[in-house]
Amino acid sequence: MNHFLDIHKTAPEDLRQIIDQAGQMKTARLGRPKGTPDDEQPLAGHMVALIFEKPSTRTRVSFDVGVRQMGGETMVLSGKDMQLGHGETIADTARVLSRYVDMIMIRTFDETVLTEMAEYADVPVINGLTDRTHPCQIMADILTYEEHRGPIKGKKVVWTGDGNNVCASFLHAAGQFGFDLTFTGPAQLDPEDEFIGFARNAGSKITIERDAAKAVEGADLVVADTWVSMHDSQSSKERRHNMLRPYQVNDALMAHAKPDALFMHCLPAHREEEVTSAVMDGPQSVIFDEAENRLHAQKAVMRWCLGV
């Protein structure tokens, strides 16, 4: 039994196994209707709990479809259903759920909820997102880059904007997969030293560059994410927009990257804010392949967790 809590907590050889299997499983499904089962049914007889303290379209649909394609069943629970940490402890909830299901995926605001769930659960726990990291997204991103351009090892990735949870997992991946990462954004939004330190200690070149055009020079991959959250106040949104406007990904910025550089965004995107429609819909964008690959990467993660 394996938990998938964070990229830096998973061995590089296991991460590589997951990526390779995801690619194989994707190829095996080419041309099939989405609702048809996989030839292999490794999750037959398995029940998977999908817990959403923080709602999501892509995470819910991709995990639900993935489980069903592999022969399993899902139970979707919202924060209202669970009341995690209010009344019954997270530890007791983990123990009880372990009697009903074979695996737990949780998308939560608080990383401590994830770690405590994993500590006390008797079944694998998968990090569907926390406010600190988003490892499943990055596995999809690695899969996407490699199916378009080959091995990501030694490549230059540029993260633009806010050093958020997705950026943190990209830094973990830099260390585990052996690529370099440049962060370009305002100093107030730098990624935490912990994430930068992990990647540097693993041998990756991590650079902080305030000038977006300089940062993107020679990039193999440029990545953006939303500047604001639905929970931000109007004044906070305006402040962040003013701070981040110099880091918008547009055609002029992409011109500084390599001619064959790719653009990624985990979606949903705010068009004409962090990225222009011209880039999103342009030939360098692989955002919809990236969205699809959440499905294939997570299927491989689930198989690895269960050892099937």
UniProtKB/Swiss-Prot annotation:
Entry keywords, A to Z: Amino-acid biosynthesis, Arginine biosynthesis, Cytoplasm, Transferase
Coiled coil: none
GO biological process, one term: arginine biosynthetic process via ornithine
Subcellular location: Cytoplasm
Family: Belongs to the aspartate/ornithine carbamoyltransferase superfamily. OTCase family.
GO molecular function list: amino acid binding; ornithine carbamoyltransferase activity
UniProt xrefs under Pfam families: OTCace, OTCace_N
Binding site for carbamoyl phosphate: 56-59, 83, 107, 134-137, 266-267, 294
Reaction equations catalysed: carbamoyl phosphate + L-ornithine = L-citrulline + phosphate + H(+)
GO cellular component: cytoplasm
Record-listed L-ornithine binding positions: 165, 225, 229-230
Keyword RNA-binding: no
Record's protein name: Ornithine carbamoyltransferase
Record keyword Transferase present: yes
